[in-house]
A protein has these predicted regions:
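Long, low-complexity, charge-biased intrinsically disordered regions
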Residues: 1-188
């Protein structure tokens, strides 16, 4: 597939200027399931209402940074990028000039990348595998709603954003610590 440079301004973020390379997912044929179970708005509203109507309940947001980018690919993909888009210092540092073919550098994608159609489902499967030993599971008939087996913690999950209802800071920290084992997280 091809590489595309995406520039974005996000004033709510610590670093509002955002530049990233995405893969042209429209050219990738992925033969397996691509849909990711995420919470819908009614599910989120129910958790919010439950928070305000449950004694001592609190609500927080958790964001996993670079969740897709840290996920190993089940099968590798390949991408080409014009060498003219790569800064000279990077070309020199990685000795890319001899690897250039017809003006392009060819790359093997071994971890998730924005634009790949399978990035979401792979990241979600890995998250599920990593949270299960800590007692977290997705409720069977409500996509994107997760609970803990015994602790008063539940959350909605949309991509890499958690809306967490909890009772007691210790219980909230249980989820944060479980996530911190494998991810860098931000909380609000």
């Amino acid at each position: 597939t091809y590489a595309q440079i995406v520039v974005d301004y996000r004033p709510q973020k610590t670093d509002p200027n955002h530049v990233r390379i995405t893969a042209g997912g429209n050219l990738i044929s992925y033969p397996f399931e691509l849909t990711t179970r995420t919470a819908d708005l009614p599910t989120s509203k129910i958790v919010w209402n439950s928070t305000i109507s449950t004694k001592n309940a609190r609500y927080m947001c958790i964001d996993i940074k670079n969740m897709y980018l840290a996920t190993p690919m089940e099968r590798h993909e390949y991408m080409r990028m014009p060498i003219s888009l790569i800064p000279n210092n990077i070309i020199q540092q990685y000795a890319l000039q001899p690897k250039c073919k017809n003006g392009y550098i060819y790359m093997e994608i071994i971890r998730g990348m924005y634009g790949l159609p399978q990035a979401g489902i792979l990241a979600n499967k890995l998250l599920r595998k990593r949270l299960e030993p800590h007692g977290y599971y997705e409720v069977p008939h409500t996509p994107g709603l997760w609970k803990h087996e015994t602790l008063p913690v539940q959350f909605t999950l949309v991509v890499d954003d958690f809306g967490v209802k909890y009772i007691g800071k210790t219980n909230a920290m249980h989820l944060i610590n479980a996530l911190n084992e494998n991810y860098e997280v931000e909380t609000d």
